[in-house]
Every structure is written in structure tokens, then in C-alpha cells.
Amino acid sequence: LGRSMERKPSLYIGKDEEGIRDVFVTMLETKFDGVTATGETFNYSGKTDILLKNVDDNSNLFIAECKFWHGQEHFKKAISQLFDRYLTWRDSKVALMVFVKGGNFTSVLDKIRESVMQHVYYVRENMKRDETSVNYIFRLPKDPEKEVFLEIMAFNFDKMNP
């Protein structure tokens, strides 16, 4: 969906984080059987942007936070927000979806990778799907032995003004 959105600027131009999130939630709602997809949903001690739950047992399957790129410090705070406020011990699959406005996408991807490896909860890289989607192993702040899979997904919304 994200790559498709990059090719269709009308899906993201003029939208804020919540508007773009709603496009993703709408698509996720129809993609999986036995799964609910919601936006701005309370989990642990805050409202996460995207939450996928198993219909049968109401367990969390996936949690995602959406952010526009505003530099490395803002990005690292977004990771901390996700881990400190939204994850319980049972949550193991999470994502940070980063929307990059304007140009210099390659430079931003380099800064994202650098920032991830500097983060206090970072353990190691797990799998690189491509240049814009990388899976990492992080640890929970309250249980350093508990590993969490964090997918960083970057989207090049180059038609948006920075």
C-alpha cells in the first residue's frame, strides 16, 4: 500500500499523520480475515496509531505508530514513545511508519538507520526487506530479555512540501 501511495500523490497530499493513517487502516481492515484494524486505539498507557487484533481471542497482533520525518531526535523519541507507552510484554510485532516529505530521501534513510542503531533499546538488525523496510530486534525497557520485532518502514512522499 505504501509504495502504491508514493505513486499516487492524491492519497497523501494535504493529509496529516492521522489522514494518512486512516488510509492504511482502511486497507488493513479488508486485507485479513479474523483480524480487526483500528486507528487511535488505547493500548497499555496511550493511544497507538494502528492496532491489529485477533477477533477470536482479542490478542494484539501488530501495533504501529505513524510519524512524519522531522529529524533524528524526533525519530528516536518516536521509537521511545512506541516502546514506553504502547507496548505490553505480550506485544512483539510493532512498526514505525515514517513519512518523508520532499526530497533527500536517501539521506533520510541513512539517518534513520543511524538513529535506530543509536537507540537505547536497539539489539540488532534482523532482516532487511529492501532499502525502505528494515526489521530490527529491540528490547522492552522493563524487561531487557524480552525481544520485540520493530519494522521501520519509510515512505517517500516527495510531492508534499517539507
Predicted features, each with a name:
Residues 1-38:
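Acidic-basic catalytic patches of nuclease active cores, encompassing PD-(D/E)XK
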Residues 25-57, 74, 142:
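Active-site metal-binding core of divalent-cation-utilizing nuclease and nuclease-like domains
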